[in-house]
Swiss-Prot record, chain B:
Subunit structure: Component of the mitochondrial contact site and cristae organizing system (MICOS) complex, composed of at least MICOS10/MIC10, CHCHD3/MIC19, CHCHD6/MIC25, APOOL/MIC27, IMMT/MIC60, APOO/MIC23/MIC26 and MICOS13/MIC13. This complex was also known under the names MINOS or MitOS complex. The MICOS complex associates with mitochondrial outer membrane proteins SAMM50, MTX1 and MTX2 (together described as components of the mitochondrial outer membrane sorting assembly machinery (SAM) complex) and DNAJC11, mitochondrial inner membrane protein TMEM11 and with HSPA9.
Pfam families for the chain: DUF543
Subcellular locations according to the entry: Mitochondrion inner membrane
Name of the protein in its database record: MICOS complex subunit MIC10
Mitochondrial intermembrane side: 37-78
Residues annotated as transmembrane: 17-36
Gene Ontology CC: MIB complex; MICOS complex; mitochondrial crista junction; mitochondrial inner membrane; mitochondrion; SAM complex
Record's function text: Component of the MICOS complex, a large protein complex of the mitochondrial inner membrane that plays crucial roles in the maintenance of crista junctions, inner membrane architecture, and formation of contact sites to the outer membrane.
Record keywords: Acetylation, Membrane, Mitochondrion, Mitochondrion inner membrane, Transmembrane, Transmembrane helix
Length: 118, 78
């Protein structure tokens, strides 16, 4: 009797946890249109770091531990779009001048060989 | 489609993919722990579903360049 009640309780607890997770996803429209997902990600980016900081401060106050300040991460600026576009333009200009350059170099090479064999 | 609009669409696609894959993975973890005895397949299933939904959204976004993304503004009662 007790075992049955306990297994029923376990099932209800698991069902409520899973149902709560599904409801949360539905309420926040995380699996909906891309606009809502982008807004949810932005909101998470604004809310999570201060919440984590406050939680760490609360843990420090309660336990008396001092968490050392981590140095700020280095800001890396690498414009992917600009370097990609510059790379594409360089490759295309190299391809466009390749026949004339090849002709020029082969002509120079031929003149050099001719001059050496005289 | 201008380059800035294309850039915005790519940003939206990436953000959407991150959210959907993460949500699918999270739901997979919940169901794996509660009902499926800590098996791995709910995680793979959830992540795969999220990836597929994000891909479908991105495909629709890039193939329909003339749709405007608006938002609902509730009328304020006077």
């Amino acid at each position: 009797m007790v075992a049955r009640v306990w297994s029923l309780m376990r099932f209800l607890i698991k069902g409520s946890v899973a149902g709560g997770a599904v409801y949360l996803v539905y309420d926040q429209e995380l699996l909906g249109p891309s606009d809502k997902s982008q807004a949810a990600l932005q909101k998470a980016g604004e809310v999570v770091p201060p919440a984590m900081y406050q939680f760490s401060q609360y843990v420090c106050q309660q336990t008396g531990l001092q968490i050392p300040q981590l140095p700020a991460p280095p800001k890396i600026y690498f414009p992917i779009r600009d370097s990609w576009n510059a790379g594409i333009m360089m490759v295309m200009s190299a391809l466009s001048v390749a026949p004339s350059k090849a002709r020029e170099y082969s002509k120079e090479g031929w003149e050099y060989v001719k001059a050496r064999t005289k | 489609m201008s380059e800035s609009e294309l850039g915005r669409k790519w940003d939206r696609c990436l953000a959407d993919a991150v959210v959907k894959i993460g949500t699918g993975f999270g739901l997979g973890i919940v169901f794996s722990l509660t009902f499926f005895k800590r098996r791995m397949w709910p995680l793979a299933f959830g992540s795969g579903m999220g990836l597929g939904m994000a891909y479908s959204n991105c495909q629709h976004d890039f193939q329909a360049p003339y749709l405007l993304h608006g938002k609902y503004v509730k009328e304020q009662e006077q």
